[in-house]
Swiss-Prot record:
Organism: Mus musculus
Top-rank taxon, per record: Eukaryota
Role this protein plays: Potential role in vesicular protein trafficking, mainly in the early secretory pathway. Contributes to the coupled localization of TMED2 and TMED10 in the cis-Golgi network.
Name of the protein this chain belongs to: Transmembrane emp24 domain-containing protein 3
Assembly mode: Monomer in endoplasmic reticulum, endoplasmic reticulum-Golgi intermediate compartment and cis-Golgi network. Interacts (via C-terminus) with COPG1; the interaction involves dimeric TMED3; however, there are conflicting reports on the interaction. Interacts with GORASP1 and GORASP2.
This protein's encoding gene: Tmed3
Sites of Dimethylated arginine modification: R103
Family: Belongs to the EMP24/GP25L family.
Residues annotated as transmembrane: 185-205
Origin organism lineage: Eukaryota, Metazoa, Chordata, Craniata, Vertebrata
Length: 221
């Protein structure tokens, strides 16, 4: 008879409980998008939000120009509740005072030739507890429940870190490609200039060693 190790059985139970809790948890209403913003252009997004609900907006310019963009948020009445100009990145959190469609816009109208790539993450509402009635419980969490909560928080941290590093990698790659293009153009320009200078020197040296013979003209009387 083969006996299963106690720690292996506990680990399987922990995974099953964590899976059930993740399936029961209601996700946040969120939108995560990376889009192109041409020069002299503005892009707006709309989201209907209930009254008394908190929403948050995080954005960052990945590529283009000085990595800056104008951003503003309007409530359903048309009042501007957030406005920033030429920001590389920022975060904004707001608790709604009225139900309706909220609009947030990104503007690149101040730029005449710089094409931008913008990332934003828009979340509505608070994250529900991973365990039911977690805030109203009288008894303490069991060891397995505490482990599930810890794993859930660690997974959230991993997701946030991956998003951060993915944006940093995209931004660094864009800068490296831009630098590579500039170095390539500079190298081509130097090559052409070197060729022109070398050809001019050859012609100049050739003129030094070319014998100039006087032309004798016969004078007829």
């Amino acid at each position: 008879m083969v006996h299963e190790a106690p720690h292996a059985s506990s680990f399987q139970m922990l995974l099953q409980l964590l899976l059930l809790l993740l399936l029961r948890a209601e996700p946040l209403r969120s939108a995560e998008l990376t889009f192109e913003l041409p020069d002299n252009a503005k892009q707006c997004f709309h989201e209907e939000v209930e009254q008394g609900v908190k929403f948050s907006l995080d954005y960052q310019v990945i590529t283009g120009g000085h990595y800056d963009v104008d951003c503003y948020v309007e409530d359903p009445r048309g009042n501007v509740i957030y406005r920033e100009t030429k920001k590389q990145y920022d975060s904004f959190t707001y608790k709604t005072e009225a139900k309706g469609v909220y609009r947030f816009c990104f503007s690149n109208e101040f730029s005449t030739f710089s094409h931008k790539t913008v990332y934003f993450d828009f979340q509505v509402g608070d994250e529900p507890p991973i365990l039911p009635d977690m805030g109203n419980r009288v008894t303490a969490l069991t060891q397995m429940e505490s482990a599930c909560v810890t794993i859930h928080e660690a997974l959230k941290t991993v997701i946030d870190s991956q998003t951060h590093y993915r944006l940093r990698e995209a931004q660094d790659r864009a800068r490296a490609e831009d630098l590579n293009s500039r170095v390539s153009y500079w190298s081509v320009g130097e090559t052409i200039a070197l060729f022109v200078v070398s050809f001019s020197q050859v012609l100049l040296l050739k003129s030094f060693f070319t014998e100039k013979r006087p032309v004798n003209r016969a004078v007829h009387s």
